Amino acid sequence: MTQWYPASPALWQGRDDSIEAPDARRLFQTVTRSETFSPENWQQKIALMGFACDEGVKRNAGRPGAAGAPDALRKALANMASHQGHERLVDLGNWVAPTPDLEGAQQALRDAVSRCLRAGMRTLVLGGGHETAFGHGAGVLDVFAQESVGIINLDAHLDLRQTDRATSGTPFRQLAQLCDAQSRAFHYACFGVSRAANTQALWRETQWRNVTVVEDLDCHDALAQMTQFIDKVDKIYLTIDLDVLPVWEMPAVSAPAALGVPLIQVLRLIEPVCRSGKLQAADLVEFNPRFDEDGAAARVAARLGWQIAHWWR
């Protein structure tokens, strides 16, 4: 059974420069840590939550270890400088899946996300494998049932696989099927896709589903496509699979990318999403601390989370 735990205060530690000036502060000094899961107490804030689950990665024959990512990323975030927007972060703890019940874990996340959004919060989730996306995205779809929701995925993989059970490779097929069941349009864009990592069958699925696809080779010039997608929806859920980054920037994932999209290009692509006023939910997934020897990859991932919170409007 999936369980909730508050984040350990030991994770939020860092260098104290406050003697220099009142605004010489770091995230460990400005992030609020909640001892209870009580989003109703934090309206207009950003709910920082961990989804400590990699059962979907295991089912997808990947390299397990992403269940340890939420706390590793908190540690990497803690000592980063606090700027405008970061004071809105409230750490609402981790959803921990200690058993192979992935479906139950996804439902728990779905319910938690729905509760946060209905309380007037926005959600920043630290996965976990990309199975995080079904629980997170379903929660967004549940709350904004009468509005068009755009799903923006930065990922080397389309994650539209067809299997007999949920995995880290199926979340967007699951979300598409949920949209079908709710009689609503499925608005999905995937940036950074590696043609070498996705079968022809998956490419056919994108055509049938009318998915916006931008390959890794073309992301240097994709702002217009991103803007067009933003303009056509009411609300946005942004999910970043860290394997979209090249292996030299992000080796600590289940499936490192030989080519990938450099961090600077990823940041330029997500800035208009964050500033659009439409972003309701975002996550970082697939980070695997087992393959991060010196903490450098955690800092790369943390910079993405830091930037999202700073730009979020």
Swiss-Prot record:
Quote the record's cofactor note: Binds 2 manganese ions per subunit.
Q: Which CDD domains match?
A: Formimidoylglutamase
GO BP annotations of the record are: L-histidine catabolic process to glutamate and formamide; L-histidine catabolic process to glutamate and formate; putrescine biosynthetic process from arginine, via agmatine
Where, in this chain's numbering, is Mn(2+) 2 bound? D155, H157, D241, D243
Looking at its record, which EC class is this enzyme? hydrolase
Where Mn(2+) 1 binds, per the record, is at: H130, D155, D159, D241
Superkingdom of source: Bacteria
Q: Name one GO molecular function term.
A: formimidoylglutamase activity
One Pfam family of this chain: Arginase
The catalytic activity of this protein is classed by the Enzyme Commission as 3.5.3.8
SUPFAM superfamilies recorded: Arginase/deacetylase (SSF52768)
To which pathway does this protein belong? Amino-acid degradation; L-histidine degradation into L-glutamate; L-glutamate from N-formimidoyl-L-glutamate (hydrolase route): step 1/1
Is the Manganese keyword given for this protein?
yes
Reactions listed under catalytic activity: N-formimidoyl-L-glutamate + H2O = formamide + L-glutamate
Q: Membrane-crossing residues?
A: none
Swiss-Prot/TrEMBL keywords: Histidine metabolism, Hydrolase, Manganese, Metal-binding
Q: Which cofactor does it need?
A: Mn(2+)
What does the function comment of this entry state? Catalyzes the conversion of N-formimidoyl-L-glutamate to L-glutamate and formamide.
Family listed: Belongs to the arginase family.
Record NCBIfam families: hutG
Q: Which HAMAP family match?
A: Formimidoylglutam
**Name of the protein:** Formimidoylglutamase
Q: Which organism is it from?
A: Salmonella schwarzengrund (strain CVM19633)
The UniProt gene name for this protein comes to hutG
